[in-house]
A protein has these predicted regions:
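Catalytic cores of nucleic-acid endonucleases
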Residues: 111-170
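Interdomain/boundary linker segments immediately adjacent to catalytic/signaling cores
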Residues: 2-3, 7, 11-74
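Hydrophobic, Leu/Ile/Phe/Ala-enriched alpha-helical segments that form helix-helix packing faces
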Residues: 39-46, 68, 72, 76, ...
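Active-site beta-strand-loop-beta-strand hairpin of nuclease catalytic cores
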Residues: 96-111, 116-117
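Non-catalytic C-terminal interaction segments of nucleic acid-processing enzymes
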Residues: 164-223
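Ampiphathic alpha-helical segments that act as solvent-exposed interaction surfaces
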Residues: 27-35, 130-145, 211, 215, ...
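Acidic-residue sensor for enzyme active/binding pockets
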Residues: 61, 83, 110
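A short acidic/basic microdomain associated with nuclease active sites
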Residues: 73-101
Length: 223
């Protein structure tokens, strides 16, 4: 009964955010909440690919960007573009993993799937460059400098032992590097996914906005 209530509560919160979005009044906070919800829905609805990725600690950014773009379109987003130029004006030549529009506002999403080295049953013991993985997320935040869009950084930390909180150190480090205050409550969702009949693992979905003010402090505009 406790689990059912918890699931209902999560669904209610996600639906509430979605209803607010449908009303056409969207803040950056609502946008990153909704993208985080979308990613959770995509991961939960594809147990086969996710189980393989978890067991092998294999990154899945390429698959995720197309799956997420498809999911966003199904939810009502428009002008979906994968590998979208961040700057329409051409000032910044970088590309985001995918972009979409809602109510005339463009959002650009940078995606990463950093894998961990933590040991857990049912997962191959493979070494992964954890420090490099999380440094790349900081770089994503630093390149999101544009007058033309609302940049969001999203990433999925995997695999994680069920209930483990060690991933919080990486969220705090990313926030420190990008001069942002990031928290579990506002920017992260921890979910459990099955990887075999006998084993499950957690993943953490994080998403946060990069304000233009922060981006301008972090990245000089190219001339």
């Amino acid at each position: 009964m406790g689990r059912s209530h918890q699931k209902s509560e999560k669904c209610y919160c996600a639906q509430a955010h979605h209803n607010n979005w449908l009303g056409g009044i969207v803040t950056m906070a609502q946008a990153h909440d909704i993208v985080r919800t979308w990613i959770s829905e995509v991961l939960r609805s594809h147990p086969g690919p996710m189980a393989i990725a978890m067991r092998q600690r294999a990154k899945f950014e390429g698959w995720l960007k197309f799956s997420l773009a498809t999911h966003a379109e199904l939810k009502g987003a428009t002008d979906i573009v994968v590998e979208a130029p961040i700057s329409v004006s051409g000032v910044n030549r970088a590309r985001s993993d995918f972009s979409f529009k809602w109510d005339g506002v463009r959002y650009d999403v940078e995606l990463k799937t950093p894998n961990t080295n933590w040991r857990m049953p049912g997962v191959a013991e493979l070494h992964r460059p954890v420090t490099k993985n999380f440094s790349s997320i900081v770089e994503d935040g630093r390149k999101a400098n544009s007058q033309d869009c609302q940049p969001l950084v999203a990433f999925v930390i995997f695999p994680i032992p069920i209930g483990d909180n060690r991933w919080l150190q990486y969220l705090e480090r990313i926030g420190h590097e990008l001069q942002l205050t990031l928290s579990r409550e506002a920017h992260a969702t921890q979910i459990t996914l099955p990887i075999s009949p006998a084993h499950s693992v957690d993943v953490v979905i994080c998403c946060f906005p990069i304000s233009l003010r922060v981006a301008e402090q972090l990245v000089p505009i190219a001339v």
